Curated annotation (Swiss-Prot):
The active site is at 248 (glycyl thioester intermediate). Homodimer; homodimerization is required for UFM1 activation. Interacts (via UIS motif) with UFM1; binds UFM1 via a trans-binding mechanism in which UFM1 interacts with distinct sites in both subunits of the UBA5 homodimer. Interacts (via C-terminus) with UFC1. Interacts (via UIS motif) with GABARAPL2 and, with lower affinity, with GABARAP and GABARAPL1. Signal peptide: none annotated. Its main location: cytoplasm. Residues 346-376 are annotated as: Linker. It comes from the Eukaryota. This is Ubiquitin-like modifier-activating enzyme 5. E1-like enzyme which specifically catalyzes the first step in ufmylation. Activates UFM1 by first adenylating its C-terminal glycine residue with ATP, and thereafter linking this residue to the side chain of a cysteine residue in E1, yielding a UFM1-E1 thioester and free AMP. Activates UFM1 via a trans-binding mechanism, in which UFM1 interacts with distinct sites in both subunits of the UBA5 homodimer. Trans-binding also promotes stabilization of the UBA5 homodimer, and enhances ATP-binding. Transfer of UFM1 from UBA5 to the E2-like enzyme UFC1 also takes place using a trans mechanism. One of its GO terms (cellular component) is nucleus. One of its GO terms (molecular function) is protein homodimerization activity. It is found in: Cytoplasm; Nucleus; Endoplasmic reticulum membrane; Golgi apparatus. Zn(2+) binds at residues 224, 227, 301, 306.
Amino acid sequence: MADSVERLRQRVEELEQELARERTRRSGGDGHCGRTRIQEMSDEVLDSNPYSRLMALKRMGIVSDYKKIRTYAVAIVGVGGVGSVTAEMLTRCGIGKLLLFDYDKVELANMNRLFFQPYQAGLSKVHAAEHTLRNINPDVLFEVHNYNITTVEHFEHFMNRISNGGLEEGQPVDLVLSCVDNFEARMAINTACNELGQTWMESGVSENAVSGHIQLMIPGESACFACAPPLVVASNIDEKTLKREGVCAASLPTTMGVVAGILVQNVLKFLLKFGTVSFYLGYNAMQDFFPTMFMKPNPQCDDKNCRKQQEEYKKRAAALPTQEAEPQEEAEVVHEDNEWGIELVSEVSEEELKNSSGPVPTLPEGITVAYTVPKKTEDSASEVTVEDSGESLEDLMARMKNM
């Protein structure tokens, strides 16, 4: 019985792929890529070189070697509003391999977000995304899985693929990206990555569609998703009970694009080692506010593998050689006497300096004055008086005219 169900499932996937090709053909695409595969990236500035603008990052001193992007494999869980745009950006950047995980189908309700097109409605998101992404960049390797990672059987397969599905079979992926829209899937990814010691990044958009965030999680070094869980997770509330019929979360393509953009930017900085990698970066569209922070791991985390990773990280940190602080040389005091015979002369004479200060009062020991009051000088100009000549104003004006 199980074998027949599996065969039927495979047949359904084959028919879905065939349907995708037929719909693409009818929509005007021939289903084939517009160019052949490029074996090696080139920095040659040509209209026909899709990597010239990317390779310019090396010439401008941003990245030491952009070609390394083709040596990395990234797994994306959730190919929706954020995940599909993230996959597209990484594909255009020339990533080596993408592994896509999602069990949902494309719907017309998804059209307010980015990437998918109306003719793809009814197809699985991973297969529709793979077909489009291959046309964008045939140099990227793709591996798609159309299932729910939170089920027991599929969770084991998910762990197997992120630990063995790297660019070379048997090697782990370099990074896992969470672009899901529920806490159950986030906790599943968190559990898998803590057990495997796999670095991953989490992303999310709020239900009102005007805020979002990304978070980098390195097991043992930074907080995992269970170290400071949301209230829904901490209270063990079933998310499905919170949903109401006829009510859905809001969604803006702008917010999805911003969150996907900062996520991929953080991925590139992490993989290619340039700039500052953010451990947490938020986005509030109402105030254009981008908060950032670092979250330390919780020693009492509910995930035992997280606590285990913390202990291993402490051991690795303790084994590193300690760097002694280098003694700082004190700057030599520069005296007024010098070999060139240059002498500093004050613009104020000794007599003027003496007259500008007053007598120092007698004070108890330990008390000094900040300044003294100079003696009052008698202004001789104030004593000059002019005698009254007795002439009227008219006489004085007449005299001035005759001058």
